[in-house]
UniProtKB/Swiss-Prot annotation:
Cross-referenced PANTHER family: UREASE ACCESSORY PROTEIN G
Annotated Gene Ontology cellular component terms: cytoplasm
Function: Facilitates the functional incorporation of the urease nickel metallocenter. This process requires GTP hydrolysis, probably effectuated by UreG.
Binding residues annotated for GTP, in chain numbering: G10, P11, V12, G13, A14, G15, K16, T17
NCBIfam families membership: ureG (TIGR00101)
Official protein name in the record: Urease accessory protein UreG
Gene Ontology molecular function: any one: GTPase activity
Gene Ontology biological process terms from the UniProt entry: urea catabolic process
Length: 205
């Protein structure tokens, strides 16, 4: 059984790379991890993760997709598949791999053959009505995150409205609010990973 793979999707600037950086920083002493970033023409996100995060550079792979970002995570996952295979061969102890998509629209989803779980993140600055649009990325993800809550007063967004809209389309699926700049709400994300993804409750039983 190989490492668990978590897809991280969302629009440009929503906080995908920062989310991976914050999670890996918090779990570095608990879990053996690696990360893969996807972008169209650069590996800038991989460089940022290596410079600002705690993962060794050799555990971070940047992929230049050269086309539509969601193709590499859904229709043709071959580049990501190869990156995962390479990481597993180099680090047999891997328990968790994050696959960050390139910035994409609200309909982007991960192939179930590529990842085991997925997170979709948006930010408040994109507008109060974004959750109401209920794109497939927000609906189908295992965890939905509304990030940059601190910006709500400055962009005229009502967080209560966003929460109610999220409840309506998420039904019983989890979602949370975060301000990753200050780690506010990160505890909810970590709790989800520990208990829903890593299933620590079962391991400790």
């Amino acid at each position: 059984m190989g490492p668990i793979r978590i897809g991280v999707g969302g629009p440009v600037g929503a906080g995908k790379t920062q989310l991976v950086e914050r999670i890996t920083r918090a779990l570095i002493d608990e879990v053996s991890m690696a990360a893969i970033t996807n972008d169209i023409y650069t590996i800038e996100d991989a460089k940022i993760l290596a410079a600002n995060g705690v993962l060794p550079e050799e555990r971070i792979v940047g992929i230049e997709t050269g086309g539509c970002p969601h193709t590499a995570i859904r229709e043709d996952t071959s580049m990501n598949d190869a990156a995962i295979k390479d990481l597993v061969e180099r680090f047999p102890d891997l328990e968790l791999i994050f696959v960050e998509s390139g910035g994409d629209n609200l309909s982007a989803t991960f192939s179930p053959e590529l990842v085991d779980f997925s997170i979709y993140i948006i930010d408040v600055a994109q507008g109060e009505k974004i959750p109401r649009k209920a794109g497939q990325g927000m609906i189908k993800s295992d965890l939905f995150i509304i990030n940059k809550t601190d910006l709500a007063p400055y962009v005229g967004a009502n967080l209560d409205v966003m929460v109610e809209d999220a409840k309506a389309f998420r039904k019983n699926k989890p979602f949370c609010l975060t301000n990753l700049r200050t780690d506010d709400g990160l505890d909810k994300v970590l709790e989800w990973i520990r208990h829903e993804v890593m299933m620590q409750d079962l391991q400790e039983a």
